[in-house]
């Protein structure tokens, strides 16, 4: 429960007028009480009560006792902002190499071409020894990126992955849906999982086609045959072209919508990548680009009330941070004001959510840990390594893109009207220049990664799914491929931006 550190102070809260101002947005509600507090006790203490407090879409029936807006809350380590300054990301080259090998071990698992979500078969959520289409698409993209698209370095894994895709793409789905939107498959045989699950998962075809388009362009550049790769890309893209407005499950496989920001951004990005691949192999990419532009126009409205929201039934979500970092070049890029505003809202929410953040903020520790969404309860509802890493990457990308602007036009003074969100987020003084902003963005990325490293240090370099919100220890699925992918990718971007630093 958010505000655990102050929840036990209920009895000490002075009695307040019953007409207290209870018009408080969900993101700013601060728990007044403790689990099990009832309405009479809540209101007798001058706090606000809602019988149906919409913390998130999966807890609609849970009531909420919270402080009114006109009350001075107990001191909160999240109210004074964050320490966004560190001089390096914490992770050493040696540690990077260990994680790289652990990551590689999860690709082409058992020589099947599959990407195992994690080798752990005894997690709080059951076995992770499956190939998730989403995890695989994102992890393969990261694998190509961190290896600089070097054909010789990635050929073995990508040839195997391409073979896997061809095998599963035309399976008959016993669940009665198009197999292209099936969430996960058994390893090594590649059969659709038949247990109960949130279906369909509509970002899957886009993410798979994204990865295969990137691989296809590498093969083309190295004189290889791309015909079979084009077949799998065009087959997945055909689904996206016809069905991008259809209802599906969210990134976390819990709620449904036709309008998830993550899914929309995955469509836009993958359509543009497929268009590039089409052009390279003599196909027509115009339809892909036109559809990407159509989706982009329909997605502009997700910036509302000062931040980018994931969906109407799950507005505050770390998936948005992932979207900006991974797909943002086509809409609301990492260096944008919308990006900074969203970081501000999301980080405040997760500081309030996790006692470990409050404790470490109070101690002045740089950075922050973030998770899926406020009110999450899966496996303890903790910070996630893959999301914290992608927040670090988002800062790095913001700095990199700011440096590129400086390269094009020289250093320049920041105009408050054009940069107020970044100035506010990073506490930049009056008179700051673009170079000051870029340095601060990189330092903020280092702050996030440094805090993450403090919690994941392990002799074997194993990176898990979550970090316990009370103890700060790694928890849940062990050796999560997606965690390796995002941490390594963030550090890869950090290395690429290093050339700009004085």
Question: Would you name each region that the model predicts?
Answer:
Residues 80-89, 137-152, 207-223, 266-282, ...:
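Well-ordered alpha-helical scaffold segments within catalytic/enzyme domains
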Residues 18-41:
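Secreted, propeptide-processed cysteine-rich mini-domains
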Residues 73-134, 160, 164, 168-184, ...:
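Low-complexity, Ser/Thr/Pro/Gly-enriched N-terminal "stalk/linker" regions
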Residues 175, 179, 184-185, 376-387, ...:
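CBM-like carbohydrate-recognition segments
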Residues 94, 133, 166-199, 260-268, ...:
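Extended ligand-binding clefts on enzyme/binding-domain cores
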Residues 31-34, 41-67:
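Extracellular Cys-Trp
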Residues 127-243, 264, 487:
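Aromatic-rich carbohydrate-recognition surfaces in CAZymes
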